[in-house]
Design a protein with these regions (language model features):
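Bacterial Sec-dependent N-terminal signal peptides
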Residues: 1-24, 572
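Outer-membrane beta-barrel translocator/receptor signature
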Residues: 37, 49-58, 64-146, 150-153, ...
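Outer-membrane beta-barrel porins/channels
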Residues: 20-34, 39, 118-576
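Hydrophobic alpha-helical membrane-insertion segments
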Residues: 11-12, 68, 435, 442
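Active-site-proximal flexible loops/turns
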Residues: 9, 66, 305-307
């Protein structure tokens, strides 16, 4: 099975409250834990280990395990590598991916910095120590860059925009409206971005037009076509990459029927660049009861920044096949087209997390934690521009949407995790964690709405029907050949929470993310210690559709994207 992610280029709408998808909620809610080099080196299997500042975000009780105060700082270098291939259309019912291309992007980050302060109560039993801490840990890295493309002689992005524009009046899309006296009034180029179509006879009268449709019309990539006496003439469209042929037949409404096709092949290219990260700032308190039982609590403040930039280009292989007749202005030929979409999201939220760690006997540790849902406020900004070029540059056109902005609230899901760890004579450590996250509990709300806010009713229903539980399993090991040196290794995998419907049943997509890590640690006889870790994260395959299917019996292009993240992390710390 596979999932297809449609790009924002085809879903940019005027109604901002309808532009969010369940994948936005998933992107902003998912955790790909970073932390210290020690925790990364052990696969973040730290629920029952503790003592490390990277473990505090996984189990708050971990801060109480260390019988000392400490400070750590952790720089990180992450390399994203993406292998992308392109299929113009189905061949024999399946995609034929080719033209594989690799792109990489490197980013520096600081996935951990913080300190804990240990206070001895002086009691020989009961509560023997309290630890206070402030720690910032990275919980996701959005870095990624990709490019893909190929030859297509069947479908076109501009053609898909022509289909999306059907039903909207050309005058409205260019900034005109009808006043109370039924007169045509110029409202300005940006009018259709904020107001519904009000032309009297439009099929879409009262509807908001998609922003990408408006920009394509205003750039001159789309136009009305055919017999101007047809009743539907002013709200049917053809793209600059298309030609039409009159059949001589009419439909039931009296409009002539036309055959529309591409007159030649196009060279198409899609590219995407994503940067950003998510962090949790933790106010922590941990309680040590006789070195046997530990409790902890976090007040977590989540912050995220997500920057998404994508483009789509198509150019005529033989422009002379793409003749364009502009009437009295003359004729020219389509050359090339480019559209670009830029999107930024910033968010913050608050949650609570509570955990315990228990040593029933020497050498065995058991731990668990529960995290409340995070209530986040997300602030979005976006813009799209369109450029269309012809062999005669005097016909070239361009358009840019206004900068859109919108804010809403997202309730991310709760998390439960449990773990066990085994130590062997102070020389070796084995640990294993299980974490579950129920993404069906995600919920979108308007910024000022309450829990029963119905603004996102349909989207929240879709989340409940198509999202479920994601399972994460983490295992780690540490071996000390000498007291000062530690060798580490770890592995974890995370399953997708997404379901697909098959008849009356739902089946989980068979996708998962795998991560492999190794690490080394040095601990001096004094206060200084240092760790280094390397991790490879292999994300699940991604299938991208750069524009919607618009022909009944022919699919639009599909891109297969294979994504890997390589990271090198170093931690420098001092105990006091």
């Amino acid at each position: 099975m596979r999932k297809a992610i449609f790009t924002a280029l085809l879903s940019l709408t005027a109604v901002a409250a309808g532009a969010q998808t369940m994948y936005d909620g998933l992107t902003f809610s998912q955790n790909n834990y970073y932390g210290t080099a020690r925790s990364i080196g052990m696969g973040n299997a730290m629920t029952a280990v503790g003592g490390d500042l990277g473990s505090i975000g996984i189990n708050p009780a971990g801060s109480a395990v260390a019988g000392y105060s400490q400070f750590t700082i952790t720089p990180n270098l992450t390399l994203s590598s993406m292998n992308s291939s392109y299929s113009a259309y189905h061949v024999g019912g399946v995609d034929n991916f080719s033209n594989e291309r690799r792109e990489s992007l490197t980013r520096f980050s600081m996935p951990n910095i913080g300190a804990t302060f240990n206070w001895k109560t002086g009691s020989g039993s009961g509560l023997t120590a309290i630890t206070y801490g402030f720690v910032v840990n990275g919980t996701n890295n959005f870095t990624g860059k990709m490019m893909a493309g190929g030859r297509n002689d069947k479908t076109s992005y501009i053609s898909s925009m022509a289909v999306a524009a059907e039903g909207y009046d050309m005058d409205f899309l260019n900034g005109y409206s009808i006043n109370s006296n039924n007169e045509r009034v110029d409202r300005g180029w940006d009018y259709p971005y904020y107001y519904p179509d009000d032309y009297t006879n439009d099929p879409n009268k009262g509807s908001y037009a998609p922003w990408n449709v408006i920009a394509n019309v205003q750039a001159g990539a789309l136009s009305n076509f055919g017999d101007s006496n047809d009743p539907a003439y002013y709200w049917r469209y053809i793209g600059a990459t298309e030609i039409y042929e009159k059949t001589g037949e009419k439909d039931a409404d009296g409009n002539y029927i036309y055959n529309i096709s591409l007159p030649g092949a196009l060279s198409q290219a899609y590219g995407r660049n994503v940067t950003g990260s998510k962090y949790d700032a933790l106010l922590n308190v941990g309680f040590n009861f006789g070195e046997t039982f530990f409790l902890g609590a976090n007040l977590g403040i989540t912050s995220l920044n997500y920057n998404y930039d994508e483009y789509f280009k198509e150019a005529a292989e033989n422009p002379s096949a793409f003749e364009m007749d502009f009437g009295e202005k003359g004729k020219t030929y389509f050359s090339d087209y480019r559209t670009r979409y830029s999107y930024t999201a910033d968010g913050s939220g608050v949650y609570g997390k509570f955990g315990f760690l228990w040593r029933p006997v020497d050498g065995i540790r058991i731990g668990g934690a529960v995290q409340t849902p995070t209530i986040m406020e997300i602030n979005e900004r976006w813009r799209q521009d369109v450029n269309v070029n012809y062999t005669d540059a005097s016909f070239n056109g361009s358009a840019k949407t206004p900068e859109g902005d919108y804010s809403y609230r997202l309730r991310s899901p709760y998390r439960l995790n449990a773990g066990a760890a085994f130590t062997f004579a102070g020389m070796a450590l084995l640990s294993a964690d299980y974490e579950m996250t129920d993404y069906s509990t995600m919920k979108f709300m308007s910024k000022n709405g309450g829990w029963n806010d119905d603004t996102y009713g349909k989207l929240n229903d879709e989340i409940r029907n198509r999202m479920g539980v994601s399972h994460m399993v983490r295992v780690g090991a540490e071996f000390k050949p000498v007291p000062e040196i530690a060798v580490r290794a770890g592995y974890n995998f995370t399953t997708t929470p997404e379901y697909v419907s098959e008849g009356n049943s739902k089946t989980t997509l068979n996708d998962r993310t795998n991560a492999f890590s190794v690490g080394l640690g040095y601990s001096s006889n004094g206060s200084f210690f240092a760790d280094i870790a390397a991790r490879l994260t292999m994300l699940s395959d991604e299938y991208i559709s750069p524009y919607a299917d618009y022909l009944k019996d022919l699919a639009s292009p599909m891109i297969l994207n294979k994504r890997d993240l390589y990271s090198i992390t170093a931690t420098f710390g001092w105990r006091f």
